């Protein structure tokens, strides 16, 4: 009787030690949690590009806008991926009908820059090749 009890106690002590050593904050991953996204990640870049594309479709401005700076990028995985972006957007010198809009220079004159701070939420289901703009909010910077 003592031997099974000792084995059980040893197993529990080993498990407790393993849990304690892996419970550091940086090692915790909570399913459905929101985490900082890697801006170098191809999927994150696709979602950001989609957000800016949808933003440009919705604006009545003839000039194309693109990110000046990504202030924050986060992601959440559950039944797909939610991406959350906080972006400073600037007005370029290119009209929306021009090719290669991603390399357009920004307006230098302050009255033409029209900078905005925008928050975008993108939902993607990669295995269905589906992406949608869930929420978009912008204000003058």
Swiss-Prot record:
The keyword Signal applies. Disulfide bonds join 94-104, 118-138. A motif (Secondary area of contact) lies at residues 76-80. GO terms for biological process: detection of chemical stimulus involved in sensory perception of bitter taste; negative regulation of proteolysis. Transmembrane segments: none annotated. The record marks 32 as: Reactive site. One of its GO terms (molecular function) is cysteine-type endopeptidase inhibitor activity. PROSITE patterns: CYSTATIN. It is found in: Secreted. Residues 1-20 form the signal peptide. The modification Phosphoserine is found at residues 21, 23. Expressed in submandibular and sublingual saliva but not in parotid saliva (at protein level). Expressed in saliva, tears, urine and seminal fluid. Pfam families: Cystatin (PF00031). One of its GO terms (cellular component) is cytoplasm. Changing residue 77 to N: In a breast cancer sample; somatic mutation. Phosphorylated at both its N- and C-terminal regions. Keywords: Disulfide bond, Phosphoprotein, Protease inhibitor, Secreted, Signal, Thiol protease inhibitor. The keyword Thylakoid does not apply. Gene3D superfamilies: 3.10.450.10. Belongs to the cystatin family. This protein strongly inhibits papain and ficin, partially inhibits stem bromelain and bovine cathepsin C, but does not inhibit porcine cathepsin B or clostripain. Papain is inhibited non-competitively. This is Cystatin-S. The lineage of its organism: Eukaryota, Metazoa, Chordata, Craniata, Vertebrata.
């Amino acid at each position: 009787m003592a031997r099974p009890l000792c084995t059980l106690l040893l197993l529990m002590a080993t498990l407790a030690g393993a849990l304690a050593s892996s419970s550091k904050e940086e090692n915790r991953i909570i399913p459905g949690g929101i985490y900082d996204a890697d801006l170098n990640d191809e999927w994150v870049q696709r979602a950001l590009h989609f957000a800016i594309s949808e933003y440009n479709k919705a604006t009545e401005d003839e000039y194309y806008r693109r990110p000046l700076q990504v202030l924050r990028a986060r992601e959440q995985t559950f039944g797909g991926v939610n991406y959350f972006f906080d972006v400073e957007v600037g007005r370029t010198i290119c009209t929306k009908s021009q090719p290669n809009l991603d390399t357009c220079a920004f307006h230098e004159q302050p009255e033409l820059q029209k900078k905005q701070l925008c928050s975008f939420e993108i939902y993607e289901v990669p295995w269905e090749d589906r992406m949608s703009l869930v929420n978009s909010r912008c204000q003058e910077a």
